């Protein structure tokens, strides 16, 4: 069964959903840009763990209504939505939010990576680091260790060792290139 629902707001969107859970969200259609945190459509979809709805709303906003995008995400801040996706394991929605700054810090000093570590979500930690989240802070390792998330702690240590090896290779190779060039320069004079 195909259901089309539209809501009245600053823009008129048509949504297609084949989910009965979706109908619980219809009360939030009246004001999709409501500044109250828990009366926001996308926030409710995230909290209720409806990734197909989050993805669909994000896709429509991203592709069709950039001006609506700014109004929707500026009220709570992109980091709040991102943190909620991390907290509720909505992996697919991360692609939308990655286009924003992945290392943004909310008013409590938390980044999405910190939220993923605290929730023990190793898959999300890996995705965030793959997308460029900064993991080179001592606080990150201590946080994983303190919360007893061994899999995350081991992953972070392995990633750190890997990045240090890469850094050392680059530094050592650059140094040997410099030495070669200096010797050539000295010999040429």
UniProtKB/Swiss-Prot annotation:
Signal peptide: none annotated. This is Putative ankyrin repeat protein L38. Keywords: ANK repeat. The keyword Cytoplasm does not apply. InterPro entries: Ankyrin_rpt, Ankyrin_rpt-contain_sf. Gene3D superfamilies: Ankyrin repeat-containing domain. It comes from Acanthamoeba polyphaga mimivirus. The keyword ATP-binding does not apply. ANK repeats lie at residues 108-137.
């Amino acid at each position: 069964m195909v259901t089309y629902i539209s809501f009245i707001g600053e823009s008129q969107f048509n949504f297609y959903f084949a989910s009965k859970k979706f109908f619980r969200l219809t009360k939030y259609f009246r004001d999709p840009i409501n500044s109250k945190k828990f009366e926001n459509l996308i926030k409710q979809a995230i909290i209720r763990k409806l990734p197909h709805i989050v993805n669909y709303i994000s896709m429509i906003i991203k592709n069709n209504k950039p001006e609506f995008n700014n109004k929707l995400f500026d009220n709570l801040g992109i980091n709040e939505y991102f943190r909620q996706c991390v907290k509720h394991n909505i992996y697919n929605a991360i692609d939308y939010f990655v286009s924003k700054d992945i290392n943004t810090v909310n008013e409590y000093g938390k980044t999405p990576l910190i939220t993923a570590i605290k929730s023990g979500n190793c898959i999300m930690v890996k995705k965030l680091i793959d997308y460029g989240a900064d993991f080179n802070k001592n606080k990150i390792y201590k946080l994983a260790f303190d919360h007893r998330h061994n899999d995350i702690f081991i992953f972070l240590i392995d990633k750190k060792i890997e990045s240090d090896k890469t850094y050392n290779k680059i530094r050592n190779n650059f140094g040997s290139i410099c030495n070669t060039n200096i010797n050539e320069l000295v010999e040429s004079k």
